[in-house]
Amino acid sequence: MVKNAFISVISQEEKEENKGSAEFQVFNFTNKIRRLTSHLELHRKDYLSQRGLRKILGKRQRLLAYLSKKNKVRYKELISQLDIREPKIR
């Protein structure tokens, strides 16, 4: 896993942003999602972790929707910085 790249980003985020901001929360959820994904590659039948992953994905999706409504520029920057796909519009 690419932990070192995220450590430098998280230290910048902690200095610049509030920990309660939507951007910081999306960043933390993304780290948790990546950790759980690598865990589930080894433990495929860990259904509680799968449920936790789905819950975190939903939370991140709601936060990203909120951020895209409030500030489109910061939303685009965050998605490109974290290398997240943009959700499909229904």
UniProtKB/Swiss-Prot annotation:
InterPro entries per the record?
A: Ribosomal_uS15 (IPR000589), Ribosomal_uS15_bac-type (IPR005290), uS15_NS1_RNA-bd_sf (IPR009068)
**PANTHER family, alphabetized:** RIBOSOMAL PROTEIN S15, BACTERIAL AND ORGANELLAR (PTHR23321), SMALL RIBOSOMAL SUBUNIT PROTEIN US15M (PTHR23321:SF26)
* Cell compartment(s), UniProt: Plastid, Chloroplast
Q: Which GO terms describe its molecular function?
A: structural constituent of ribosome
Any keyword Transcription?
Answer: no
The record's annotation in Pfam families points to: Ribosomal_S15
Q: Does the keyword Heme apply?
A: no
**GO biological process per UniProt:** translation
**Gene3D superfamilies assigned to the protein according to its UniProt record, in alphabetical order:** S15/NS1, RNA-binding
Checking NCBIfam families in the record gives: S15_bact
Quaternary structure? Answer: Part of the 30S ribosomal subunit.
What species does this protein belong to? Platanus occidentalis
What is a single cellular component term in the Gene Ontology annotation?
ribonucleoprotein complex
What is the protein name for this chain? Answer: Small ribosomal subunit protein uS15c
> What are the protein's UniProt keywords?
Chloroplast, Plastid, Ribonucleoprotein, Ribosomal protein
Q: What gene name is given for the protein in this entry?
A: rps15
Q: Where does the UniProt entry say this protein principally localizes?
A: plastid
The similarity comment for this entry is: Belongs to the universal ribosomal protein uS15 family.
